Amino acid sequence: MALFSIQRSALLSLFAGLALTVWAAQWAAGVAESEARHEFQQAAAIRALQLKERLDAYEGVLRGLQGFFAGSEEVDRGEFHRYVVRLELKQDLPGVQVVGFARRVPLAEREAFITAVRSDRRLLAEGYPTFAIRPPGERPEYLVIDYTEPPQGNEAAFGLDLLSESERRSAAERARASGAAAATAPITLVQETGRQSSFLLLLPIYRNGASLLTDRKSTRLNSSHANI
């Protein structure tokens, strides 16, 4: 009887020890999982903050352009070029591939606009004799990329109608309706030769004197943009 009691006691101790070991292992795993989850959440929060700061910096570039246009009766191609060059974006914001200005062109003004761009010799002595709005065709209005910086490597974007493609048009319409910056979903830029994804950030530029509260949908709208 005593032997049975001793064996039973040893068995209970073994079971208790095993149960305690399993519980400790589960507790340790839970702690590790909790710590890993906490570290992941911290890393995600830091990454989100960094992304927001970077997006704020991108938007700041466009806000600066908005103010530059607001302070001038008309910003020509040479002035736009000199302004963007002074920003030194390649050094400070290397994620920005191109900064541009898209001009709203009603159908009735299309031919006059094309003629004006082709004969613009402020940057190139020969002007832009082959300039055309792309894709071709008659549409009620166009939002045409008129200025690009740097122009080298972004020739394919020059003349693109942002309203001709659904994702770009949606971002432009949201920007006009809100008066705030709007971004596209990831897209492949027309100047890309591969499948690299980027996104387009647009900020509206209204004609001088327009009421942003009452005339957003009816006023003449241009747009500054950055490809990122």
Model-predicted regions and their roles:
Residues R37-A45, A70-A226:
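Intrinsically disordered, low-complexity polar/acidic regions
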Residues L3-G30:
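Extreme N-terminal signal-anchor transmembrane helix of membrane signaling/transducer proteins, especially
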Residues W27-G60, Q66, A70, E74, ...:
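Juxtamembrane membrane-water interface segments immediately C-terminal to a transmembrane helix
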Residues L14-A24, K52-Y58, N154-F158:
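Short low-complexity stretches enriched in small and charged residues
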Residues M1, H225-I228:
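Residue positions that mark polypeptide boundaries
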